[in-house]
Amino acid sequence: MKNLLKIIPILLISLTTLQSCNDDTDNELPYEPEVPTTNSIVDVAVGAENLTTLVAALQKADLVTTLASQGPFTVLAPSNDAFNTFLSDNGFSSLEDVPVDVLTNILLNHVIGGRLASTDLTTGYASTFATTSASDASMSIFIDTSNGVRFNGVSSVTDANIEADNGIVHIVDAVIGLPSVVTFAVADPTFSTLVAALTRNDLTTDFVGVLSTATGTSPAPFTVFAPTNDAFGL
């Protein structure tokens, strides 16, 4: 009997301890693994009200997967107004009227490899993901940072350094068309004397018209040895 009386308090303590452990377990929240969030260049474009036409263009050109991949990419993103001007200037009533192959290469002309913030951009040439039809070589783009940031002399950055997980986005105010020899001669100030020489009123040949001929159309393509202003000695 005495032994039984000794055992009862021990059992009560054990039961109390067990109940306390169960209560602690019941109050614990179930484990929820952390789900990584993504914010790709495509996500940035989808979330921007002034880039809806760009998103539609990427979908039509089947480039969504490309720009959602690892990268890194620097994307020059034309605004809705920029696309509207591009469509109007080229005689298209809507994005659907632009041939897919043309649209794809134009969009790729806005993509540069690497993550280039505005402070990383310097005056000079860079390679884009657009390719030439003649040799499948990467097309170049001329960057001018003398007064803001301007591309090929036609498109300026209006909103810079929008970060994404796989790169960076700079919103621009004009669609950057596929370049010709004339594009770079006009955009690059080191060729201003050459441009002046080729556009003199007394010339009988329309050099600008000839050198603007698209690849695949005679007499293109061209290889031009372009003297700089220093070469002219001016």
How would you name each of these model-derived features?
Residues M1-I8:
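Bacterial N-terminal signal peptides that target proteins for export
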Residues L11-L15:
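Alpha-helical transmembrane segments
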Residues T16-S20:
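C-terminal motif of bacterial Sec signal peptides marking the signal peptidase cleavage site
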Residues C21-L234:
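Mature, structured domains of secreted/extracytosolic soluble proteins
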